[in-house]
């Protein structure tokens, strides 16, 4: 009953997305559009200091204001939370210490937003100022005061891994290249600001509507912090006006409105303003990198040694994973037989960094692709041909045990080289104009969940009605990337109906099976497999019934054009609605489920959980620039990009994702940065955000976009649904280094950091010796001894030779950060509840609160 790719009616065809009409007519309801009866409004009082103890909070004047219903402080929600089990260091409101300008101290709930905002000014907070840690260098040299009570001083995480004898391989190299790079932090700049609404049902159950990418993880955080059974909480992810990773964490404002709704018995809404979104941040980590690569004279890599230093901000967030990601994927693009990676993440008194499109990988990709260009120049090799000659092998294991499937990168390079006229232009354009190339790879979903378990990563449930309507339920979140469209198209393809015949219920923890969320480019692959499985099971039930009714062999049943019929005699059959009725008569009410869990990783060492993926996508990019030597201005004239998508399920959506990546990448490459400055001494010398608004934080507009030529390269991977791979994040990665390499071709300078501003171009042009702008040195870091993992070609089994015994994990588990009082009482704690693990403040440090 299955179709061959050439016989597909939905998959692979350009189609209008199923939610397009609602969006273009303004009918889509985002979180801030929700208005409920008797709804109250919430605002957060944020710290004006980057690092201070909270000594006293006096909320009496605020509570005395007409219309103010509630003031909350950290003492009302003392249980810590965090997206990673190893970094439970955040609180809904600060308990006893603020750690960056913008950290929330108190919340006001009032009849309207204006009253709530005015009440914030009536709250008096006494602070004891503490030393501010401004950057990673200061964090490394200043262990006290500690920003967080865990970690090594102000170092959050250090990792060290080695795959093969890197030093010996370097000694045998014909040439060794060593460079230092810097990638500035930047933020997501989603059009929609964060918003949430909390409400309590008549039966006492909590519902939270939120502009989140991860309703499942928000659901877990609410159960933990509010200490109510998870089954009594419903999280609904509203359509997102963009996320890009910035809405992947559970956030304090979500917990605050949920708590307020529980206490007041009325709906409570919060919508952050743009400045507050900058404080939420969780964007790109600033990363300093030192990359050392040994090569033979033909350009083949013999070893690579990468060190990274991350500025993590004040909290853990995804930081442990981010640290590993700065080194995990360096081996899946080119052949790297021996590899050493060391990474360090520090705490600083800034808004916390986290995942942004490409999570942790654009920074080292920038370094690797520029150094590949430097290698090509030194060896007098064509940069495009050098890359093509060193590509990783398909269906292979890398040195760090990433399992590669199909690789369409060679064809990607061919297409951009041909389309751009590379051979006629590279090194041949007049001074001031140049062309550059870079490649990249990215994962199609993380191989492990954020909390370890053996449960499916995505589930889909189908309900078939005798009217012919199909309803698909899934926990996946539509954040603008088109996941709802993918779900409808895949189910429609299997059942032979139109995608618009399918009703979608997504992002609702009460109604849909669990999906872990929209991050790591995981949704198409993981939800897609679950959707196909559920649809195939439904098709099987219907086919059995129709086959028996008409006396037709199952092998001849065809589902197409809203009909179920005999392949040899198409007139014999039923409409799809009639076929569902036949199926219901035989089997009873029709409903099926599907689920997906990635295959087991080959990496068995500690830290090997970050990087493995069911499949990897690949991209190649060529950029042409014009540079004004007098001003340093860089104008991007044209972009050619080819992306190995496996199979394009909807080419229109795929092209939109590619071109959206180009837009975001050009902003990172040329202008966007999360920069900070010190206030004057008479204004407390606080470390504050330099550009906390869209007026000053420069980002490209439509007028800044160059012409983009997009090539979708289809090299189907059996790990993906119908061979599909990701397209939402990977195309961003090669853009920044391709632009930097084009700059070198244009005016002969290297700018080894982003953003590449006119000032940096002028600085490099004025450097008569190095013709370069970028960091000169990488700081000395006391690295731990690396875990040594023999690569596969040296007989390795994915385990570290020098790693001690690890805790054995058996079966599916419920992670310990879900607190369910009354369901699992602990006799040694008051009220029979267990004490939560995490970072809490001693009672002696708790501030006095006056209400």
What are these regions (language model features)?
Residues 1-156, 176-179, 447:
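Flexible, low-hydrophobicity surface segments
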Residues 145-226, 391-469, 683-711:
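Helix-loop-helix junctions that connect adjacent transmembrane helices in secondary transporters/permeases
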Residues 446, 451-512:
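Catalytic phosphate/nucleotide-handling subdomain of diverse soluble enzymes
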Residues 18-22, 121-130, 134, 213-215, ...:
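Extended active-site and interfacial segments that coordinate phosphate-rich ligands
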Residues 792-849:
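Intrinsic disorder/low-complexity segments
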Residues 234, 239, 243-265, 269-272, ...:
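Thiamine diphosphate
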Residues 65, 74-75, 227-232, 262-268, ...:
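C-terminal catalytic domains of large/alpha subunits in multi-subunit enzymes
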Residues 13, 19-22, 153-196, 286-370, ...:
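Glycine-rich loop/linker segments at domain edges
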């Amino acid at each position: 009953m299955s179709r061959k790719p050439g016989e597909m009616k939905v998959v692979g065809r350009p189609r209008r997305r199923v939610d397009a009409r609602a969006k273009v007519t303004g009918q889509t309801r985002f979180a801030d559009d929700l208005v409920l009866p008797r709804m109250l409004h919430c605002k957060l009082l944020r710290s004006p200091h980057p690092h201070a103890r909270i000594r006293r909070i006096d909320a009496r004047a605020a509570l005395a204001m007409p219309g103010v219903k509630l003031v909350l402080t950290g003492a009302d929600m003392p249980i810590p939370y965090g997206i990673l089990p190893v970094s439970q260091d955040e609180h809904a409101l600060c308990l006893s210490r603020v750690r960056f300008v913008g950290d929330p101290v108190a919340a006001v709930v009032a009849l309207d937003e204006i009253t709530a905002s005015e009440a914030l000014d009536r709250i008096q907070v006494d602070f004891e100022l503490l030393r501010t840690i401004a950057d990673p260098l200061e964090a490394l040299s200043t262990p006290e005061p500690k920003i967080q009570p865990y970690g090594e001083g102000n170092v959050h995480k250090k990792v060290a891994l080695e795959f093969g004898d890197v030093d010996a391989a370097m000694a045998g190299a014909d040439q060794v290249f060593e460079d230092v790079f810097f990638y500035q932090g930047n933020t997501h700049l989603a059009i929609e600001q964060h918003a949430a609404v909390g409400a309590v049902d008549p039966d006492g159950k909590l519902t939270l509507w939120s502009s989140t990418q991860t309703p499942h993880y928000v659901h877990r955080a609410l159960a933990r912090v509010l200490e109510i059974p998870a089954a009594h909480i419903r999280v609904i992810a509203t359509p997102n006006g963009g996320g890009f990773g910035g809405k992947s964490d559970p956030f304090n404002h979500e917990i605050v409105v949920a708590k307020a709704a529980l206490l007041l018995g009325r709906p409570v809404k919060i919508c952050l303003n743009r400045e507050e979104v900058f404080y939420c941040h969780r964007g790109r980590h600033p990363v300093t990198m030192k990359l050392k690569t040994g090569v033979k004279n033909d350009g083949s890599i013999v070893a690579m040694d990468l060190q990274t230093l991350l500025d993590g901000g004040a909290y853990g967030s995804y930081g442990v994973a981010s640290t590993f990601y700065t080194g995990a994927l360096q081996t899946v693009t080119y052949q790297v037989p021996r590899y050493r990676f060391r990474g360090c993440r520090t705490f600083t008194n800034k808004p916390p960094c986290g995942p942004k499109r490409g999570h942790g990988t654009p920074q080292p990709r920038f370094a690797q692709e520029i150094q590949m260009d430097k290698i090509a120049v030194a060896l007098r090799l064509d940069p495009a041909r050098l890359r093509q000659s060193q590509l990783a092998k398909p269906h292979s294991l890398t040195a760090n045990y990433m399992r590669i499937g199909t690789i369409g990168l060679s064809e990607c390079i061919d297409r951009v080289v041909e389309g751009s006229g590379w051979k006629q232009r590279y090194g041949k354009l007049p001074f001031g104009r140049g062309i550059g190339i870079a490649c990249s790879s990215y994962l199609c979903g993380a191989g492990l969940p954020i909390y370890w378990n053996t449960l499916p990563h995505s589930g889909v449930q189908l309900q078939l009605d005798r009217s012919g309507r199909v309803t698909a339920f899934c926990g996946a979140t539509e954040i603008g990337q088109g996941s709802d469209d993918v779900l409808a198209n895949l189910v429609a393809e299997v059942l032979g109906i139109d995608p618009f015949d399918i009703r979608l219920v997504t992002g609702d923890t009460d109604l849909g099976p669990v999906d872990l969320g929209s991050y790591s480019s995981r949704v198409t692959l993981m939800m897609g497999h679950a959707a196909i499985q559920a649809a195939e099971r439904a098709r099987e039930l219907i086919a059995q019934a129709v086959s028996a009714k008409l006396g037709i062999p199952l092998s001849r049943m065809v589902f197409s054009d809203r009909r179920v019929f005999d392949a040899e005699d198409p007139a014999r059959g039923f409409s799809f609605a009639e076929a569902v009725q036949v199926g219901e008569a035989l089997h009873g009410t029709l409903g099926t489920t599907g689920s997906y869990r990635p295959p087991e990783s080959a990496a068995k060492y500690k830290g090997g959980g970050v990087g493995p993926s069911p499949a990897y996508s690949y991209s190649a990019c060529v950029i042409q620039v014009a540079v004004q030597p007098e001003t340093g201005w860089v104008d991007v004239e044209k972009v050619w990009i080819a992306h190995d998508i496996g199979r394009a399920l909807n080419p229109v959506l795929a092209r939109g994702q590619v071109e959206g990546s180009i837009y975001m990448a050009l902003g990172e490459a040329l202008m966007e940065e999360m920069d900070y400055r010190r206030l004057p001494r008479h204004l407390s010398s606080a470390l504050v955000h330099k550009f906390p608004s869209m007026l000053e934080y420069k980002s490209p507009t439509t007028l800044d976009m160059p012409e983009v030529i997009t090539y979708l390269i289809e090299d189907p991977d059996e790990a993906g649904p119908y061979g599909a791979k990701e397209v939402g994040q990977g195309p961003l990665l090669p853009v920044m280094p391709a632009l930097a390499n084009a700059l070198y071709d244009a005016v002969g300078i290297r700018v080894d950091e982003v953003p590449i501003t006119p000032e940096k171009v002028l600085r490099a042009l004025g450097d008569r010796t190095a013709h370069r702008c970028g960091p000169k040195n990488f700081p000395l870091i006391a690295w731990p001894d690396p875990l040594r993992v023999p690569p596969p070609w040296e007989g390795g089994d994915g385990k570290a030779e020098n790693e001690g015994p690890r805790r054995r994990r058996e079966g599916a588990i419920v992670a310990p950060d879900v607190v369910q009082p009354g369901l699992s009482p602990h006799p040694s704690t008051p009220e029979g509840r267990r004490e939560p693990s995490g970072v809490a403040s001693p009672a002696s440090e708790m501030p006095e609160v006056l209400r």
